[in-house]
Amino acid sequence: REIDEWGISYALGVAALRALAEAERKLGIGEGESAGIAGSSESSEALNNLKIGAILDGPNDYITKALNTFDAPDVPIPADVTCKVKGDRHCATVATAAVIAKVTRDRLMVKFAAQPQYAPYEWANNKGYGSAAHREAIVEHGPSDLHRLSWHLV
C-alpha cells in the first residue's frame, strides 16, 4: 500500500531506514550506555566513531532522500550510501542480498498462494511475476489486496 501511496523510491527509502533503525536498536546504538553493545566506556567511544554503510544496487540513493522525512523513523547513525549500477555483478554482498531477497519473496508468495482468496493468481507457480496466467487472472478476477495498483497489472 505504501508503494502505491508514496511511490516506489520513497517507499523503498522508508523501508530501508526502518530496517536500519531496527538493526541499530538491536545493537543498542542510540539507546545510551546501558543497552546492547554500548555497555562500557570503550564501546561508547567506539560508537561515537561508528560508521554505517549501505550499498544499493542501482544508480539511485533512495535512502538518503527519505532520511529525516515525516514517514521515516529516527536513525541514530545514518548510513553512508554507495550506489553501484549492476552491483550484483560486481559485489558479492549485493549479489548475496539479491538472492536472499528473491528467495524470501518467492517463499512468501507460496504462502500467500495457499490462501483461498489468492488461488486464482497461481502464485505457487509464478511467484507473482507477470506470467500470462497471472495477467489473465488479474483480468478475470481483478487485482487482489496484495497487488500494487500503481504497477501496470495487465
Which positions does each model-derived feature cover?
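RNase H-like, Mg2+-dependent phosphodiesterase core
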Residues: 1-154
